[in-house]
Amino acid sequence: MIKDIIKNAEEKMQKTVTVLKSELGTMKAGRANPSMLDKIQIDYYGSMCPLSQAANISSPEPRVLMITPWEKQLLKEIEKAILKSDLGLNPSNDGSIIRLVIPELTEETRKDLVKKVKKTGEESKVAIRSIRRDANDKIKALKKDGDLSEDQVKKGEDDVQKKTDAIIKDIDKIIVDKEKEILAI
C-alpha cells in the first residue's frame, strides 16, 4: 500500500519536472531552438494544432529558425500565429519558408529571463511539496484506518521525503543550468 502511494507520488513529481523542462525549453536564450515554438498553435483548416505538426522547424544557424510548412497556403497563418505569440519575434516570409532571426539578448532581457526561470522553478518546487503533502496525508490515513503501525508510517514519510529532496535537487540543477545558458554571452 505504502509502495503504491510512494510510486504514485514519484510519478507525479517526475511529470512536474518534465513540464518544467518543457516550459524552460520554450524560453529564448539568445540561441535558436525549435522548442521555442512548441506553444504556438495555428488554425489548420478550422482546428487548432501545434506548429510542429504543420511544418518542419530547423535551426540552420545559431540564431536563425527556419519554418518550412507542409503546405504553402499555411505561410500566412503561421506568420500570424508567431506575431500573436509572446515571443517577440518578427517572421520573414519569402513565399516558401519563414525565417525567424533570434535577436541578441540585452543585459536587461537576460535578467528578466532569469527572474522568469527562477519563478517557474519555484512554482515547480511548490507543486512537488504539494505532492509530498498529499502522499503523507494518504499514509497517515492508512494509519488512522489501522492498516499501518507508527513505524511503517514514519518509514513511508521518510521515503517520500527522500524522493522529494532528490527531485528538488534536480529542479535546482535544471534552474542553474538554464540561468547559465541565458547569462552566457
UniProtKB/Swiss-Prot annotation:
What GO molecular function terms would the record report? Answer: ribosomal large subunit binding
Give compartment(s): Cytoplasm
A Pfam family that this protein carries is RRF
Record-level GO BP terms: translational termination
Tell me the superkingdom of the source.
Bacteria
Q: Name one GO cellular component term.
A: cytoplasm
Q: Main site of residence?
A: cytoplasm
InterPro entries according to UniProt: Ribosome_recyc_fac, Ribosome_recyc_fac_dom, RRF_sf
The alphabetical list of record keywords is:
Cytoplasm, Protein biosynthesis
Q: What does this protein do?
A: Responsible for the release of ribosomes from messenger RNA at the termination of protein biosynthesis. May increase the efficiency of translation by recycling ribosomes from one round of translation to another.
Query: So what family is this one in?
Result: Belongs to the RRF family.
- Report the protein name in the record: Ribosome-recycling factor
**Organism, per UniProt?**
Clostridium botulinum (strain Eklund 17B / Type B)
Lineage of origin? Bacteria, Bacillati, Bacillota, Clostridia, Eubacteriales
State which gene encodes it: frr
